[in-house]
């Protein structure tokens, strides 16, 4: 039998059976919930503040469930880790569906025992504005990977950053700059960062908004020339592609912003890393790799991706021509034309979104390699060249999911396709987007930064 659900307008007090120890004696688990609300700014975000009588807990989490979900629903609930350093243990419940009922309880560990509160009813969630229209076509329901997709409206209007759950429902949304290329939660999952595409170097914008919508900053100083993409790093740092000089397709800088607003140019993305195409550069995607503190960077003009250490040391080049390449014998020439989103895993699996020359009617491809990257050599073996179901000469993304599925984002055609390990379609979300990033929950570091 489920626990009784309580909802009181003011403070909520509840005692569960004695658990934990306080000075060596059993102590009752008496919880006080001082705030139980949904955010006024983003009404799919729950806000809970609480306390536990007696000895403070050493760890805690809040577990919630949606009331009466349909049988096919994947997003039925979740759990939020509690930051015990925050006042009143303030915790946000993220990933809630619009206009839905939820119940939650608190689990707190102290003295080697777990205190579990009764269930409390969260106020009904509200409707999101802006919230794009999304249609979903499911081919293999049992093969869907639970989780969330963090994305943006791309080049469509109205502009927004938003999050989809695995059912195709929008569970979070906020205003975004015009033509937002990437929206991405920071490493701690506290803020949503966004960057405008700014493809022709005429002025861009980076901004962020907290996940409850209460804190925001537009037009981040010093990043007015940011373009296309950003990536997040531990410690609240954000790294962005920034045009180095005025003009058409110049080199870029990788600029890292710290939480205190300090900007640091880590390195230039230009002839020091690879040869331009007829003197033109166009870096268009970047990802931070926590497993060896490095970055992968894509450039559509010379049709290549490079891997660079956080201090600017070139590791390898994949794609383009190797004649005179700064990577030397750590270069693997390839014949594809135009590339954007990509994903490098720690085991050497590498996936690339290959746009092709769409003025010739080319269909987008997803190319998978197995990279062998050692101190002595670098090689790339082709594993798969998947012919996609969309076309578009800019943007586009790909990500390998933990369960073996692959998420393909056709930004121009306005669809995100989940494929099973055999490259069969699992489901398709039809919605106009920029780049897109999957994550299993909305807490903690992303699986692909």
Where are these regions (language model features)?
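Histidine-/acidic-rich catalytic cores in large beta-rich domains
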Residues: 37-41, 57-59, 101, 107-449
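Bacterial signal peptide processing site
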Residues: 20-22
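Generic preference for well-ordered secondary structure
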Residues: 3, 34, 46, 76-80, ...
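Short, surface-exposed linear motifs at loops/turns and structural transition points
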Residues: 24-127
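C-terminal motif of bacterial Sec signal peptides marking the signal peptidase cleavage site
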Residues: 15-18
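Bacterial N-terminal signal peptides that target proteins for export
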Residues: 1-8
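Intrinsically disordered, low-complexity segments enriched in polar/charged small residues
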Residues: 8-9, 71
């Amino acid at each position: 039998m489920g626990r009784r659900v309580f909802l009181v307008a003011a403070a909520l007090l509840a005692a569960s059976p004695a658990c934990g120890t306080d000075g060596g004696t059993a102590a009752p688990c008496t919880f006080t919930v001082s705030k139980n609300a949904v955010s006024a700014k983003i009404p799919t975000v729950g806000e809970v503040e609480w306390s536990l009588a007696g000895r403070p807990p050493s760890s805690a989490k809040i577990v919630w469930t949606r009331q009466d979900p349909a049988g096919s629903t994947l997003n039925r609930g979740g759990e939020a880790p509690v930051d015990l350093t925050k006042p009143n243990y303030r915790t946000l419940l993220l990933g809630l569906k619009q206009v839905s009922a939820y119940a939650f309880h608190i689990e707190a560990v102290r003295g080697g025992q777990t205190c579990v509160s009764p269930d409390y009813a969260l106020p009904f969630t509200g409707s999101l504005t802006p919230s794009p229209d999304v249609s979903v076509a499911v081919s293999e329901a049992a093969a869907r990977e639970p989780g969330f997709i963090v994305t943006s409206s791309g080049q469509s209007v109205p502009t927004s950053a938003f999050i989809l759950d695995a059912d195709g429902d929008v569970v979070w949304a906020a205003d975004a700059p015009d033509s937002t290329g990437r929206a991405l939660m920071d490493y701690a999952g506290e803020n949503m960062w966004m960057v405008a595409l700014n493809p022709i170097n005429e002025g861009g914008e980076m901004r962020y908004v907290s996940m409850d919508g209460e804190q925001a900053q537009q037009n981040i100083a010093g990043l007015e020339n940011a373009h296309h993409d950003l990536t997040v790093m531990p410690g609240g740092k954000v790294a962005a592609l920034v045009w180095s000089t005025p003009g058409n397709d110049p080199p870029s800088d990788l600029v890292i912003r710290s939480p205190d607003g300090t900007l640091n140019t880590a390195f230039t993305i230009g002839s020091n890393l690879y040869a331009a195409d007829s003197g033109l550069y166009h870096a268009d995607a970047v990802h931070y790799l926590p497993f060896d503190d490095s970055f992968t960077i894509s450039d559509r003009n010379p049709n290549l991706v490079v891997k660079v250490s956080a201090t600017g040391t070139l590791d390898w080049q994949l794609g383009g021509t190797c004649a005179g390449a700064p990577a030397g014998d750590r270069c693997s020439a390839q014949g594809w034309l135009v590339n954007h989103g990509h994903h490098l895993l720690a085991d050497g699996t590498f996936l690339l979104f290959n746009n092709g020359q769409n003025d010739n009617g080319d269909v987008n491809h997803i190319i998978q390699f197995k990279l062998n990257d050692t101190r002595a050599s670098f090689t790339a073996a082709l594993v798969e060249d998947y012919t996609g179901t969309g076309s578009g000469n800019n943007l586009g993304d790909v990500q390998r999911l933990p369960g073996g599925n692959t998420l393909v984002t056709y930004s121009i055609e306005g669809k995100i396709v989940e494929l099973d390990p055999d490259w069969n379609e699992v489901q398709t979300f039809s919605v106009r987007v920029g780049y897109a990033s999957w994550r299993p929950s909305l807490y903690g570091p992303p699986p692909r930064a």
